[in-house]
Structure formats: structure tokens, C-alpha cells
Amino acid sequence: MTDVTGAPADVLHTLFHSDQGGHEQVVLCQDRASGLKAVIALHSTALGPALGGTRFYPIANEAEAVADALNLARGMSYKNAMAGLEHGGGKAVIIGDPEQIKSEEL
């Protein structure tokens, strides 16, 4: 179950109306001290632990970041399965411009 307390309406709409891929978990993260805003999506762990990566990209808004993370995580599930790996799919999307956000934490 995903805790979406306080999530913006556009993010909730994306989560509940665009996720036809049956994701296991979606986590919205924010750390004000470091400036981190991120979405972590786990599509499937049916074959094993989720395997994926992180995208650090200047996405326009949180709803687009959620949609991006959902699509990328689903794609990782399919790629891992087709490669014969015993892993599911997951992906993290960090919202921000890596050229401008240069805190030590990030």
C-alpha cells in the first residue's frame, strides 16, 4: 500500500488512473535539507528483487515524474525477464536538474 498523504491532486490522478501495469509499490520521497524530491516505483518482484536504476532529470512536475517512474520500472521488469535474470523491475526518478542541484547529499 502506498502512503499518498499530502500528495498533490495531479500526482494522485496519475497514480490511480495511469497505473495499468499493476505496480507493487510507489514511494514519493522528499528531503528538504538536501533538496531531494524523488519517486521510487517497484513494478514486480515475482522473479526476484527489483533491479533498475536512477534517473536524475529536470522533469516539469511530480505527476510527470510518477508516470516516468511507472513506465521505466515496468520496462525493467520486462527487460530483466527477457534477459533470463531472476529479478523484477524498479526505478527511481529524482526530480531536478543535475546541472543546478549540487548539494553534497545529492
Swiss-Prot record:
List the active-site residues.
Answer: K91
Cited Gene3D superfamilies: Leucine Dehydrogenase, chain A, domain 1
Q: What's the chief localization of this chain?
A: cytoplasm
A GO cellular component entry from the record: cytoplasm
Extract the InterPro entries matched here: Aminoacid_DH-like_N_sf, Glu/Leu/Phe/Val/Trp_DH_dimer, Glu/Leu/Phe/Val_DH_AS, Glu/Phe/Leu/Val/Trp_DH_bac/arc
The subunit structure is: Homodimer.
Q: What is this protein called?
A: Valine dehydrogenase
Q: What is the lineage of its organism?
A: Bacteria, Bacillati, Actinomycetota, Actinomycetes, Kitasatosporales
